[in-house]
Swiss-Prot record:
Protein name: Small ribosomal subunit protein uS3
Lineage: Bacteria, Pseudomonadati, Pseudomonadota, Alphaproteobacteria, Hyphomicrobiales
Bias (Basic and acidic residues) ranges: 231-241
Protein source organism: Beijerinckia indica subsp. indica (strain ATCC 9039 / DSM 1715 / NCIMB 8712)
Role: Binds the lower part of the 30S subunit head. Binds mRNA in the 70S ribosome, positioning it for translation.
InterPro entries found in the cross-reference section: KH_dom, KH_dom-like_a/b, KH_dom_type_2, KH_sf_prok-type, Ribosomal_S3_C_sf, Ribosomal_uS3_bac-typ, Ribosomal_uS3_C, Ribosomal_uS3_CS
Length: 241
């Protein structure tokens, strides 16, 4: 059933960890879960232009630490940190805890499945040919080090009368192999003819250690090796300001 299940959910606790990282006492769980859902919904709505890959929420003692992974951290921070203050106030209205906002830069958006799916959705909304958008995304991902990528586009593609599914794959994407580091992202394009669904699977190699934090460590090491640390630097600059 590896082809049917969400590849991130399948690997949780093996080499992937959750995007919400906290423990709740009995009776608090549903309240905090709904808080997380509202926070993510509001942030994604307000940061449409910031190319947000994922939002991680941690809750140390009486705090709510929100880490935004973005390909355009400058858009999130704004001039002299003005926009990030607005975001902090926005999130503070949704939770009783003290809010801390961190920004992490996504160094290679071309191999981030969520950002690739969003990019294709935006191109379809601008009436770019779906085959061209898919092929361009596949070529960029392979060029930047992905070992395999698969893209599915479904709906009334090109304004066709009958909805259909088109897919494009290059390299290999082993969905059954649990040690495989497979990133997965979905997006919806709202076109004049209706909605089109985009699904993206990107295979980035294998993670041999059995540790839920292994994938996070791998991405941090890749960022550091590629001259990363931009997100950390921006956090320090913001805190200093």
């Amino acid at each position: 059933m590896g082809q049917k299940v969400n590849p991130i959910g399948l690997r949780l606790g093996i080499n992937r960890t959750w995007d919400s990282r906290w423990f709740a006492n009995k009776g608090e769980y549903s309240k905090l879960l709904h808080e997380d859902m509202r926070i993510r919904e509001v942030l994604m709505k307000n940061l449409k232009q910031a190319a947000v890959s994922k939002i991680i929420i941690e809750r140390p003692h009486k705090k709510c630490r929100v880490t935004i992974h973005s390909a355009r951290p400058g858009v999130v921070i704004g001039k002299k940190g003005a926009d990030i203050d607005k975001i902090r106030k926005l999130v503070s209205k949704l939770t009783d805890s003290e809010v801390v906002i961190n920004i992490v830069e996504v160094r290679k958006p071309e191999i981030d499945a969520t950002l690739v799916a969003d990019s294709i959705a935006q191109q379809l909304e601008r009436r770019v040919a779906f085959r061209r958008a898919m092929k361009r995304a596949v070529q960029s991902a392979i060029r930047l080090g992905a070992e395999g990528i698969r893209i599915n586009c479904s709906g009334r593609l090109g304004g066709a009368e009958i909805a259909r599914l088109e897919w494009y794959r290059e390299g290999r994407v082993p969905l059954h192999t649990l040690r495989a580091d497979v990133d997965y992202g979905v997006a919806t394009a709202h076109t004049a003819y209706g909605t089109c669904g985009i699904k993206v699977w990107i295979f980035k190699g294998e993670i041999l250690e059995h540790d839920p934090m292994a994938q996070d460590r791998k991405m941090a090491e890749l960022d550091h090796a590629g001259g990363g640390g931009g997100g950390e630097r921006r956090r320090r600059e913001r805190d200093a300001a």
